[in-house]
Amino acid sequence: IGRIVINPDNHNELVVGVTGHLYTKNEERGIYKTSDGGATWEQTLYINDSTGIIDLAFVPGNFNIMYAAAWEKDRKAWNFKGNGNGSGIYKSIDGGTNWTKISGTDSGFPAGENAGRIGLAVYDENTLYAVLDNQFRRSKKEIDPEKSDGLTKDMFKSMTVDTFLKLDNKELNQYLKRNG
């Protein structure tokens, strides 16, 4: 279970984010909803057999508007992959009965094969905060030492101890500010 939210105005209405089995794929994951205090449950969001819901949050004062964080993961005893195309953010405007994916390539939020675990916090109807365990690799930038303003990481790789000890403190501090 990733998260359970209870309607503050109706304690019989609950929405549950289910992450799924830890080491195997299964279809019993996604979002489940009950309106009768748990006597019956309906799966209202299913993405795939390796993507579950790790977080749920609703707008304070408006249980109808809620957000869900989907997390695709594949855990084995010998390996863990915590990212995938299934990871993303979904929105419901009817208390968790229907869901629409709001994250994607055009949303401005990182999406795709390297999107990882997402945490959510809702401030109001217009403000959603999301934190992403981003598995996207940054492209390596080549720095020309002759055009550089100062020290570079590659300079340290080939630097002798004596050269390092003779570095100007101002130049070293500038490097640390740029890269620290």
Annotate each predicted stretch with a short phrase.
Residues 1-180:
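Beta-propeller blade termini and top-face loops
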